[in-house]
Amino acid sequence: MIALIQRVKSASVQVDAEIVGKIDSGLLVFLGVEQQDNIEAMEKLATKVISYRIFNDENGKMNLSLKQAGGALLCVSQFTLAADTGRGLRPSFSKAATPEQANHLYEAFIDYCRLQGVETQIGRFGADMQVSLINDGPVTFNLQV
């Protein structure tokens, strides 16, 4: 399971010109699910995302987690993160989970974050989305489990 996380001052996602998710300060999370992923991997990744200390403390040091900083999370499904780009000039998506498996783990990820007390907004699984953000830093990490 893959989470590309970006620290943002704000972010939103639109589907058919309608805003379906919007946050102020926090994390924009692009979530990719691979075939071998399961609930255990999802819980491990979700815990890492919400606990990862990438927000500045009072001394300007990256030392606070999303929860400690009081930030929100905007989660967007993105199967292209599971692409194999090692050969040729066209990505292969053979490692990506089926839409059914990916949607199940995407929804479980969202539920898990909410149960941990994190304000969580979402995109729409499988939709053509337009994502807008104002990066903070920029600070971007690729987390995998």
Curated annotation (Swiss-Prot):
It is found in: Cytoplasm. The keyword Cell wall biogenesis/degradation does not apply. Keywords: Cytoplasm, Hydrolase, RNA-binding, tRNA-binding. GO terms for cellular component: cytoplasm. Transmembrane segments: none annotated. One of its GO terms (biological process) is D-amino acid catabolic process. GO terms for molecular function: D-tyrosyl-tRNA(Tyr) deacylase activity; Gly-tRNA(Ala) deacylase activity; Ser(Gly)-tRNA(Ala) hydrolase activity; tRNA binding. CDD domains: Dtyr_deacylase. A motif (Gly-cisPro motif, important for rejection of L-amino acids) lies at residues 137-138. Homodimer. Belongs to the DTD family. An aminoacyl-tRNA editing enzyme that deacylates mischarged D-aminoacyl-tRNAs. Also deacylates mischarged glycyl-tRNA(Ala), protecting cells against glycine mischarging by AlaRS. Acts via tRNA-based rather than protein-based catalysis; rejects L-amino acids rather than detecting D-amino acids in the active site. By recycling D-aminoacyl-tRNA to D-amino acids and free tRNA molecules, this enzyme counteracts the toxicity associated with the formation of D-aminoacyl-tRNA entities in vivo and helps enforce protein L-homochirality. This is D-aminoacyl-tRNA deacylase.
